[in-house]
From Swiss-Prot:
SUPFAM superfamilies: PapD-like (SSF49354), Periplasmic chaperone C-domain (SSF49584). This is Chaperone protein caf1M. One of its GO terms (molecular function) is protein folding chaperone. Its main location: periplasm.
């Protein structure tokens, strides 16, 4: 499973430098580093049956990293069984450099009447002393902790963005259907219904003036948002969706069905 860490997805690995267990250790020095890469887009709209799309990745570190890219299913718990190919799947990216990934559909069956959701996850793998792909001692020194560090914790950040597979049969964009969301309160939850064929990616959501953690609403489906306490009698819900470019659309507001 990919662990959720703040606004990105992270995989945590631990490395301990050796020290004598039976010797006196008045102080154990701890150190930690995060290793991540940036993706040039906040989401990818993949036209179904397209030959492929390109997305850029950048190494923000001051030493080289290995870039590993994978496609995961909607719940992000396993690699997608649908035939998407990312090339190159694994490569070295030097310090402060940028490169491109190509994502291509290689078959598979997708619904033609609504979008499908996958995730592109890109991870920067830091070098270790024994790695032969790091041929520069200076780069290794930049990565490795001081010799007096007793415990060294590594955070290899797995940065994921939505890969929205959009059939050519769909007309329009999500923002043209955003106001059609319907809302009701049931069992202490705020239920949103999305009748459109598009994923509605909620960027901002308030109910009774209080902010609600946002989430996407699948096409032709519903999503239940947990409500905080103290909202008895509240009726007004306001929301903004995230558009195809990653920006917030206009504000919509309705009274819920009780």
């Amino acid at each position: 499973m990919i662990l959720n860490r703040l606004s990105t997805l992270g995989i945590i690995t631990f490395g301990m430098l050796s020290f004598a267990a039976n010797s006196a250790q008045p102080d154990i020095k701890f150190a930690s580093k995060e290793y991540g890469v940036t993706i040039g887009e906040s989401r990818i709209i993949y036209p179904l049956d397209a030959a492929g799309v390109m997305v850029s990745v950048k190494n923000t570190q001051d030493y080289p990293v290995l870039i590993q890219s994978r496609i995961y299913d909607e719940n992000k718990e396993k690699e997608s069984e649908d035939p998407f190919v990312v090339t190159p799947p694994l490569f070295r990216l030097d310090a402060k450099q940028q490169n491109s990934l190509r994502i291509a559909q290689a078959g598979g069956v997708f619904p033609r009447d609504k979008e499908s959701l996958k995730w592109l996850c890109v991870k920067g793998i830091p070098p270790k002393d024994e790695d032969i792909w790091v041929d520069d001692a200076t780069n290794k020194q930049k990565f490795n902790p001081d010799k007096d560090v007793g415990v060294f914790v590594q955070f290899a950040i797995n940065n994921c963005i939505k890969l929205l597979v959009r059939p050519n049969e769909l007309k329009g964009t999500p923002i043209q259907f955003a106001e059609n969301l319907s809302w009701k309160v049931d069992g202490g939850k705020l239920i949103a219904e999305n009748p459109s064929p598009f994923y509605m990616n909620i960027g901002e959501l308030t109910f009774g003036g209080k902010s609600i953690p946002s989430h996407y609403i699948p096409p032709k489906s519903t999503w239940a948002f947990d409500l905080p306490k103290g909202l008895a009698g509240a009726r007004n819900v306001s929301w903004r969706i995230i558009n195809d470019q990653g920006g917030l659309d206009r504000l919509y507001s309705k009274n819920v069905t009780l």
